[in-house]
Structure formats: C-alpha cells, structure tokens
C-alpha cells in the first residue's frame, strides 16, 4: 500500500512538478515552498511590535515599539511571518492576480508558524474562531477564491501551538465585506483608513458576543483593514481580536 502511494506521488510529481512560489523554478520536493535562492531572500520578521507587527530592536520582552505604545488598536496583538518583498511579494501578487489558488494553499504552510504563536496559551485565553478577512462578492467572483481563506485553511491544520482536535473552528461567513473598496496599492495610512471605513459587517452578532477571534490575511500594509475588521467585531461584542498576516509591508 505504501509502495503504491509512493509510486502515485512520484508519477504526479513528474507530470505536475512542484514549482517555486517565487520564481516558478521546478522544485525537487513537493514539500518545499521556495527554491533555495528564493528561500534565502524571504526575510522573517523576527522580534516585532505587537501593534504594527514591524521589526523592532528592543528586548524581546518589550511588546510595543515606541511609535505604537500610545496608539489605540482595536486588536490586542498582531503577528506576521515575513517582510513583504522579493520572492514572497512576487508569489503573493501571482497568487492574487494570476488565478493561482494552489499557490495560496502552498503559502499557507508559511502562515502556520505565526498563527501558532497567535493561538498559543501564553498569549491569552483560547480563541473561539479563526476569521479570514473577506473579499467583496464582486471581487470574489472575479478572482474565484479568497486568498485569506485558502491561507487560513492550510495554516490552521499545521499550526504548531495546539493539537488538531483543540484548534478553533474556521468561520468563513461571520465577517462580511459590504463595501467594494478600490485597489489600494500604494495608498498611505490615512487613505487606507478612509477607504476601509464601513467596509465590513458582522453577519450574526449573537455569534460574536463574548468570543475571541483571530483574523487572517495575506498582507498587512498599514493595519487599517485589520483594525477596521477588529472594530466591527468589537462593536458586536467580541471579547478580543488578534491578527495574523503572512507578510508585513515595511514602511
């Protein structure tokens, strides 16, 4: 049985070889996400601020950077895996705009580590549900998939913090996008806050009251989208919201 399964896997690899998410080079293993060169150029965030998720160089015990310590966030903690740039940025753009849902499922492996940190008991009480940041229905029809959902599906199954049976559920319908925001591209923080204001709504407040959530998205650019989602959940009675991104854009 094992031999047959290995043979099928080998045949599939020959017919449809795994390719690097960054440069599209054929990989030697289906388990890899990047080739060696792209993996080296994909930079982990490391020690980061709990508010903006940007790298900071203070002691690890210091959660907040000087710029965020006096700010009021709607979420309690932010986590990100990598700096947005280089091969990872190429992979994310290709995933979102090149009709590559399978790329989202592969990149989801890289989201498992920060999601595990967000779910860890040392961070706070247990999370009730993981929420992917939703797309507007029009954009979902155009793209064919929600990259945040695809990332979350994979990352949830591989998050190292908790055994599979005790993982929070993934709720894909609780948070809705009710305003079709334009592509924000290089928009600054204030423009992004204005663009996403009123863009999200809760489908059923009864499923929110007193609950704790983790929001998941592909890129955290300024934090405006995460903060707006967290505010909407907070107004509906959420006890806590943490946020997790695959990549964090550097200022």
What are these regions (language model features)?
Residues 1-251:
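Glycine-rich phosphate/pyrophosphate-handling loop used in enzymes and phosphotransfer proteins
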């Amino acid at each position: 049985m094992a031999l047959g399964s290995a043979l099928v896997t080998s045949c599939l690899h020959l017919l449809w070889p795994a390719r690097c998410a960054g440069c599209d080079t054929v990989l030697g293993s289906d388990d890899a996400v990047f080739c060696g060169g792209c993996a080296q150029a994909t930079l982990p965030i490391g020690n980061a601020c709990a508010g903006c998720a940007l790298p900071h160089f203070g002691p690890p015990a210091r959660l907040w950077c000087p710029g965020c310590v006096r700010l009021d966030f709607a979420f309690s903690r932010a986590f990100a895996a990598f700096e947005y740039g280089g091969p990872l940025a190429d992979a994310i753009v290709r995933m979102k705009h090149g009709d590559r849902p399978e790329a989202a499922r592969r990149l989801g492996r890289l989201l498992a580590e920060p999601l595990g940190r967000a779910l860890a008991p040392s961070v706070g009480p247990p999370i009730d549900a993981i929420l992917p940041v939703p797309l507007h229905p029009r954009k979902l029809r155009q793209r064919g998939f929600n990259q945040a959902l695809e990332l979350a599906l994979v990352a949830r199954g591989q998050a190292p913090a908790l055994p599979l049976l005790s993982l929070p559920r993934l709720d894909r319908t609780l948070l809705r996008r009710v305003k079709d925001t334009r592509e924000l591209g290089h928009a600054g923080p204030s423009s992004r806050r204005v663009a996403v204001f009123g863009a999200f709504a809760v489908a059923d407040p009864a499923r929110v009251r007193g609950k704790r959530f983790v929001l998941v998205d592909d890129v955290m650019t300024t934090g405006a989208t995460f903060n707006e989602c967290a505010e909407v959940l907070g107004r509906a009675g959420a006890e806590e919201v943490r946020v997790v991104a695959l990549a964090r854009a550097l200022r």
